């Protein structure tokens, strides 16, 4: 039976060999840390689409483990809710992220990308994460929400602490991470409370003003839900894209043949981004709790036990993807689940796709001599979000 430490730096740097061992030897694996690990595509999709696997108990599960009350907003956003509340909250913001609306943002996204590359070109090198992958989606989501982009340094630290808290259920009870994550949520809630007060007095044509209007219209959205939704949109609105651009660029630079193919075939970019999402996706796992006993792969998962469907493992499952460890930008029938599946499918997927396509396409065209400065870039210590701390490149 294969065992693994989910927070081991070596595993986090390259989890895929471990995923393959688990999938082969113990695909429904019960960890000594008291949670279930699913690594087969079929099982992961089954859980994500099964209404018996729910999310609302997760906040209380973590709070009980650490003996702390859930911080403000935890359990109140659509990410943490089950129907009917999930349906109501998602409906309030879904119109802002439709493919049609996102297509209207292409020109602005291209403008931001061109500006960031122009700034880096003179230097001949950059940290691709800090100077390109991060500022692009932050600029875009700030403009959509109506958040002053000059405040991004303030919420960058909060965002990092909040996302570190996503792995709280895996940490020892003495860990300070949940408390730090809670403090960041408090700070970000206070920040948005101030912005909400400003927009109540002077509404604008931004998403924040639209959410406030919905809240003021009746019982569609409470103030606590409004603040939780703002935090979710700001954090999730850039984290996925940062990691898509960073992981995707690294994969291309490590596969020069595929990089050359992309440069020679610009029309390949949409297919390329889908393959990059599958090959080394920005979100590696999610979590659910069954509302009743459920049998998967011959093993019974008890009501109330934590289940972790590993998206990153499912997207390398040879039963679904032939030759799954090969990067193939022309891969067909690429039904990856990098953005999830079912009712919690990533609301911002159309935006992340367009940002990723424009960023990577422009990067490889404008910087034909782009290359890595180090062969061993450092990864963030996160099981949930797979992303690089830095990615030094030169050109």
Where in the sequence are the language-model features?
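Cytochrome P450
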Residues: 1-395
């Amino acid at each position: 039976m294969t065992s693994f430490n989910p927070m081991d730096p070596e595993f986090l740097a390259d989890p895929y060999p471990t995923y393959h061992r688990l999938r082969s030897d113990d695909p429904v694996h019960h960890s000594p840390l008291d949670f279930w690990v699913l690594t087969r595509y079929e099982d992961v999709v089954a859980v994500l689409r099964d209404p018996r696997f729910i999310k609302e108990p997760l906040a209380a599960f973590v709070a009980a483990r650490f003996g702390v009350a859930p911080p403000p907003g935890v359990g109140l956003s659509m990410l943490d809710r089950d129907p009917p509340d999930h349906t109501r909250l998602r409906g309030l913001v879904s119109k802002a992220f439709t493919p049609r609306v996102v297509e209207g943002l292409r020109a602005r996204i291209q403008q931001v990308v061109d500006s960031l590359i122009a700034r880096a070109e003179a230097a001949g090198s950059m940290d691709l994460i800090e100077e390109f992958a991060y500022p692009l989606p932050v600029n875009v989501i700030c403009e959509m929400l109506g958040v002053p982009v000059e405040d991004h340094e303030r919420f960058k630290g909060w965002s990092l602490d909040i996302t570190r808290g996503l792995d709280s259920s895996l940490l020892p009870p003495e860990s300070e991470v949940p408390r730090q994550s809670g403090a960041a949520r408090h700070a970000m809630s206070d920040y948005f409370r101030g912005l909400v007060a400003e927009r109540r007095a002077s509404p604008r044509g931004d998403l924040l003003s639209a959410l406030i209007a919905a809240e003021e219209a009746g019982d569609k959205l409470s103030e606590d839900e409004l603040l939780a939704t703002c935090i979710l949109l700001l954090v999730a609105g850039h984290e996925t894209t940062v990691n898509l651009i960073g992981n995707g660029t690294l994969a291309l630079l490590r596969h020069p043949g595929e990089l050359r193919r992309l440069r020679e075939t610009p029309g390949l970019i949409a297919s390329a981004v889908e393959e990059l999402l599958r090959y080394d996706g920005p979100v590696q796992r999610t979590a659910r709790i069954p509302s009743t006993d459920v049998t998967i792969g011959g093993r019974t998962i008890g009501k109330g036990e934590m289940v972790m469907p590993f998206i990153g493992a499912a997207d390398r499952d040879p039963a679904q993807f032939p030759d799954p460890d090969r990067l193939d930008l022309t891969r067909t029938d690429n039904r990856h689940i990098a953005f999830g599946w079912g009712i919690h499918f990533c609301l911002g997927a159309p935006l992340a796709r367009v940002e990723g396509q424009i960023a990577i396409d422009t990067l490889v065209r404008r910087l034909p001599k782009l290359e890595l400065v180090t062969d061993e870039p450092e990864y963030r210590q996160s099981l949930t979000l797979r992303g690089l701390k830095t990615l030094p490149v030169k050109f």
